[in-house]
Amino acid sequence: MFENLCTLPLSSELFTQTLHPTEPILAVGLSGGHVHAFRLPVEEQELDEHGDADGNGSVLSTGTSTIETEWRTRRHKGSCRTLGFSGDGGVLYSAGTDSLLKAAASATGQVISKIRIPNSNTDALDPPTLLHALSPQTLLLATDSCALHLYDLRDVSSFKSGKPAQTHYPHDDYISSLSPLPPTEMSTSGFSKQWVTTGGTTLAVTDLRRGVLVKSEDQEEELLSSVFVGGLPARGKYGREKVCVGNGNGVVTLWEKGVWDDQSERIIVDGGGKAGGESLDSMVAVPEELEGSYGGKCVVVGCGDGSVRVVRVGGMKGVVEDLKHDDIEAVVAVGFDIGGRLISGGGETVKVWQEKVEDEEEEEEEEQEDIEDHDDDVIGGSGKRTLEKDSDDSDVKADSSDEEDGGRKKRKKKKRGKKGQVGNGILGFKGME
């Protein structure tokens, strides 16, 4: 379960965000063309018995730390539409409505190189929709014209000239999401060579060498977001690896890996599965270390109504937690940093969420309440059951269960109220104007 740690105000509307693969750094792209890099707060490293740092940092929840601005710049003329770190985090790629793709040093923000995004049909600008660093050798870039460009990062001259190594058209509409498929056991590089994209009302799979492999049937509903989830429990004809896709009507559809012609399962997230459900604009898989809190594999979806929902996609499927990012603005981006913190972005704010942890005092209070509840049941329960040894005995058990459930609800409500005093404030921010 997550609790809100802090809220980061932005200078203009958020269009995109990305998280560093090895450091607690968040980069955001804004509607005004600015790109900001923030260092998220971490707890002072605890010392072990020998006085050495154990290296395990976590977010400070005392309200005394700050989110530091690493750097900020006006990177694009027009809005910054998409961002992505390289695999090692050394380079931050950005692309904007000025049809420029730029590579910058992530530590300083200084531009290393830039190219103009080509438009194969006309000389007009072809703004990007998303980018993804597939490997140290390959950068993927999708555009408004439905093109998917592959840039070979090993060929410096090719990258500087702006000419992509390959261009594919997997959809008849712009590409709304891209999810790499894990490398096979036979892979020697360890990097993905296939990926799933959504665009319009179809899903497609593209291979680095062979191009577009397959395109799904028309789903008759807009496909907006996607993520690959492995390690699911095998059940009947369903396998252990799926791609989860967020639709425009509040439904998450599951797609069996290798069976790409049509969806296999549907999970209703909003609106009862009918037209009018909120759009599922962004999606990310919950890290393995947090799955225990939810009893199985889960994804987090950012919704058009400003809510953030945790959806279990393995076992008993459905929404298991509902968070609120904003009352109006859609959540256009969700992600997890290296510390397992959930980062949601939408409107002019970014929110940081951490796993809810009970402190020692709360645990002791709950244990004492459980003991008192148990003593009350022992004292009052035996006489009641002796008098009612008939068919009404089942009703007594049901009433007892209801009382216990009510006690739990009261304790949970009390706990939420206490933590709410910590997690809802806006921390100080260095470098913000």
UniProtKB/Swiss-Prot annotation:
Domain of life: Eukaryota
Ranges of the WD repeats in the UniProt entry: 9-48, 75-116, 120-161, 218-265, 275-321, 326-363
Segments of skewed composition (Gly residues): 420-433
GO cellular component: nucleolus
Compartments (UniProt record): Nucleus, Nucleolus
Acidic residues composition-biased segments: 357-378
Basic and acidic residues composition bias: residue spans: 385-400
Region (Disordered): 355-433
Stretches that traverse the bilayer: none
Name by which UniProt lists this protein: WD repeat-containing protein jip5
Biological source species: Sclerotinia sclerotiorum (strain ATCC 18683 / 1980 / Ss-1) (White mold)
